Amino acid sequence: MDPVVKKPSPGGVQHRVTKGLRAIVGHACRHPIHTLLVTALTAATTHLHVLEGTYQAAHRGLAPWAKETPLNVQSFLCGSRTVTLGEASAWRWQIDDRPKVSEDGQSDFHWALVTLDLPGASVDASIPFLSNTLSEFLGAEQITPTPDSSPSPDHSALTFRVPYSQLDGFLQAVEIIPSEKEDDSWRLRSPREEGSPTSLGHWVGSSWLSFLHRVKHAETVDLVIIGLSYLAMNMTVVSLFRVMRQLGSRFWLATSVLLSGAFAFVLGLGITTTCDVPVDMLLLFEGIPYLVLTVGFEKPIQLTRAVLCVSEELRGGWQRPVPNGASSDDSRQSQLIPNIIQLAVDREGWYIVRSYLLEIGALALGAVLRPNDSLGHFCFLAAWTLLIDAILLFTFYATILCVKLEITRIRSPGGLGQVNAKHPSGIFGHKVKSTNITWWKLLTVGGFVLCHFLQLSPFFYRVMGEYMANGTLPPTAVSPFKEAANGLNEIYLTARVEGFETRVTVLPPLQYALESAGFNISATKRSTFDGVLDGLESPLGRLCLMGALVVSLVLNNHLIHAARWHAWPQARESAVPDGSSLSVPCSATAPEVCTRPPEETEALLKSNQAESLTDDELVELCLRGKIAGYSLEKTLERIAAGSSCSVTRLDAFTRAVRIRRAAVSKTPSTQNLCSGLAESLLPYRDYNYELVHGACCENVVGYLPLPLGVAGPMVIDGQALFIPMATTEGVLVASASRGCKAINAGGGATTMLKGDGMTRGPCLRFPSAQRAAEAQRWVESPLGHEVLAAAFNATSRFARLQTLTVAQAGIYLYIRFRTTTGDAMGMNMISKGVEKALEAMAAEGGFPDMHTVTLSGNFCSDKKSAAINWIGGRGKSVIAEATIPAETVRQVLKTDVDALVELNTAKNLVGSAMAGSLGGFNAHASNLVQAVFLATGQDPAQNVESSSCITTMKNIDGNLHIAVSMPSMEVGTIGGGTILEAQGAMLDLLGVRGAHATEPGANARRLARIVAAAVLAGELSTCAALAAGHLVNAHMQHNRSAGATVKK
C-alpha cells in the first residue's frame, strides 16, 4: 500500500503550489549532478563577482595612497563630533554639531583635536619634526594623548591641537611623516569619499580596526548580549547536527543544510549589492545570529523527516505482495527515489512554503518601512536570502537527499532507513503542534523587527554617519570625552582662565600606512591574489577549468546512473514472482530514523514490549549497559516470542549477532580499532546460530570460513575413506594424499585400539597428611572402589568407572578417575560423575573433614602434555601400521627404504630424545590431528595431548614397515562442535556421526582409528620428502609465492 498523502483540494492555492514544487523537485532529483553543479557554480560566480569588484578597484590604482589629488578635509570630518564650552553651557562641555558664527562674522575660538594613529612600536624620532615644524608653520601644538586612544596595541598615537581654520594645511603637512629609519615613512590613508570604490584589503583592514575600536568603547552589557546571541546560534547549529544524527546522518546532511544556507546568503548578498543597497557590516554582524535563531533549521529537518518516512513506508510496501489489479512495475516505479522525494513534498511542501512566505513577508515589510535605515537594508538582504534558501531547499538540498538515498540503497538495497509513524516530528525532537510552530515563528519575527524598530540597544543601532557607496562599514561617530579627554581638559583650563567661548571638533583617528622607500607592503600582499585571478582569466586557465568541469560532470552523472543500475537488479531479485506472499521479519534490518528517547526504549524493554525496538535502539541499549552483550540472544528470543510477527528463533539469533557487531564497532574504548567490524568481511549471515547458542560459543559476532580439503582415498581396516582436513597450511593435504597412495599400494592401513578411558583428577585437601594417607588407602581398597564406582556409574548410562589412580602430596590427595564415556569425548560426563563420587566418599567413607579444592587438579592431565598421559593413556590409545613395498617407496615417495629408516631413527627418535621431548617422537603428527579435529568438530585445544605420538620404521624383507602409536587420542562423535552442521557433514563423510546404534562408543573409537591412520599417512609422506630433500621445494610450490627472478 502506498503511503497516505493528504492531498490538497484541486484548484486551490495549496494544490497549485504543491504541483509546482513536485515539478521542481522532480526535475532537480532526476538530474542531481547537474543541479548540484549549477548551484555551486552560481554561488561561486556570485562570490567571485563581489570579491573581484572590490579587488579590481584597488588594482586600478584607487587606493588612497595612490591618489595625486589634494586631500579633502570634509572626508576626514566624517564621524567627527563638535563640543562647545562657554557661559551659555555654564562652562561645561556640551555636544553641538551645528555650525555657529559670532555676530561680527568671525568664528569663535575653534580648535580641532587630531590624533595620528601610527603603526609601529616607537615614533620618538618623528616627534621633533612634528612638534617643531608644525608649531612654527601652523601653530599646531602637541598635547598628551588619551590612553587607549589607538585601536590596536601595536600602534602609537600622537595628539595635536590645531586651529580649525588651519586644519587643511595641517593635514597636507602630515600627509607624509618620516620614521626613525631613513628609508621608511608613514603615509596618511585618507577615507573614501561617497561613491568611490575601495580595495578588499582596505575594506577588511578598516573593518577590523573599526571592530576593535567599537569593542573597546562598547558597553559591557552590549558585548554580553552579542556573545550570548552567537552562543545561542552555535547551539542551534549543534542541535542541527544532533537531530540529523538521530535521523541517520552523522555529518553530511547537516553540513549540506549549512552549505545551502551559505549559498543562499552569498546569492542574496550578490542581489543586494547589485541593487545598490548598502550593506551595514556591523548590523549584519549583529543581526545574523538573530536571523538564524528566528528562522532556524526546522524546514530542512521537516523535509528530511518526510523523505525518510515516505522511504520507509515504501520500503515496507515493497516487501508486501502486489495487490490484485495493481502492476508490479507501478509499485516499483513509485519507489524511485525522485518519486519518494516528490511524495514527501506532497506532504510537507505547502507547510514549508507557507512558513517561508510568513518570514519573507515580515522581512519585506521591515525593508519597506525603513528604506533609508540600516535595519531596512538588513531586512532587504535577509528577505532575499530566505527566498533563495527556499529555492535551494527544493532544488539543491532535495538533490542532496536524493544522492543520500541512492547511496543508502546501494549499500543496503531496500533498507533506506526506518521511520516510526507513531512518533510525529517536532522541533529538535520535541513534540509541537504545527499551528504552534507557525504562530511561534510569526511572533519571533515580529519581535525581531520591533526590537530593531525601537532601537533598544544603543550599541546595536548606533548611527555611524554616511554609508559607503559599495556597502562597506560607514565611519563611526567618535566619543569625544573618551577619545580626547586629555586634550579637552587642557583646552578647558585655558578657556576658563581667559573666559572665551570655545568650540572643539574631535576628529576620528587618522590612519597611517608604513612604507619603505616608496614601496607599500599591502600592495605586495595583493599581488599574490592578483596572480591567481590573472591565471584563472588566462586562456589556458579557462581551458583547464572547463576540461575539469566536463570530466567531473560526465563521471558523476555516470556514477549516479550506475548506482541506480546496481540497486534495481537486487531489488528485483528480492521480489516475489507471480504475486506470492513474502514472509518478512517484523524487526527491520535498517537503522531507525525517527529514534525514540532513551527513557522510552528502556521502559519498553523493562515492560516486555520491546518488539518495536529497532537495531539502532538495541545497540544504544547495549552501549548504555541496559542489555548485557552476552544476553542479546535471550533478549531477542524473548522479544520474538512475544511478537505478533512470525519471527523464528534463528532470525532472533541472527539479529543478535548483527546487533552485537554494531555494538562492538561503536564501543568508545575500542572504537579506534573495532569501528569497522560491523561492515567487515567477517560473514555472519546464513548460519545456524541455534546450534551455537549455549553449546559452542558466546558473544558471537560471526563465523570464520576455513578451507577444507580431503586426503585420500585411503584404505583403513579394509574400508576406503576420504579424510577431511581443515587447514590454512599449504602442502599438508597434498602430502597426506601422497602418503595415502603409498599406503594403499601396500594393502592399506591397519589400526588397533589399545585402550579407551577418559580421565579426571580432582584435588582433595585433608587436615593432615595422615588423614590424606588414610583416604588413599580407602580409595585403593575394594570397598572404596565399590562405593565410588556405584556413585559414579549412577550418573550416566554410558559412564563406567574403570580404574582409580591415587597420588599424595602432603595434605593434598589426587585421585585420577578413568572411565568409558560412550561416543562422547566425555569431559562433562566424567566431571558430573566425579562430583557425585566425592560426595559419596565424604559421606560413606568417613571423611567429613575432606575438602574438594578443585574438580580438576591437573592430575588428569587435560590439554597439557604429561608423562602420565604418555604412559597410562587418556581417551583412546590407538596404533596404526602399514607395510609399503620397496617399489612404491621408490616410485611414489622418491626415496628408498633404508634412507627412510635411518631418517626416522635419527630425527624422530634420537633427535627428539636429545631435545628431551615428551610424546613428540614424530615428524608432525600435530598437523594432521589438528586438521582432522577442526574438520570434525573436536576440541582444538586437546590436540596438545592427542598428538602425542611415536613413529617407528623398519626394513622388513626389503619393504618398509611404518607404525604410529598414539596413547591419548581424545575424540567424540556427539556433543561439542560435532553438533554444528558443517562439522556433522564431515562426520557423515566418515560414517561416524552421532552415537552408535548398537555399540556405545564404537563411532568415537572408529574416529580415533581414522585420525591415527591420517597421522600415519602424513608421517610417511613428510619423512620421505625430508629423506629425498623435496620438502623446501614442495612448500615453495604450494605454500609460497614465486621467488624473485634474478636478471642475468
Swiss-Prot record:
SUPFAM superfamilies: NAD-binding domain of HMG-CoA reductase (SSF55035), Substrate-binding domain of HMG-CoA reductase (SSF56542). PANTHER family: 3-HYDROXY-3-METHYLGLUTARYL-COENZYME A REDUCTASE (PTHR10572:SF24). Pfam families: HMG-CoA_red, HPIH, Sterol-sensing. This is 3-hydroxy-3-methylglutaryl-coenzyme A reductase. It comes from Aspergillus terreus (strain NIH 2624 / FGSC A1156). InterPro entries: HMG-CoA_N_dom, HMG_CoA_Rdtase, HMG_CoA_Rdtase_cat_sf, HMG_CoA_Rdtase_CS, HMG_CoA_Rdtase_eu_arc, HMG_CoA_Rdtase_N, HMG_CoA_Rdtase_NAD(P)-bd_sf, HMG_CoA_Rdtase_sub-bd_dom_sf. Its EC number is 1.1.1.34. Residues 54-220, 272-276, 370-377, 461-542 are lumenal.
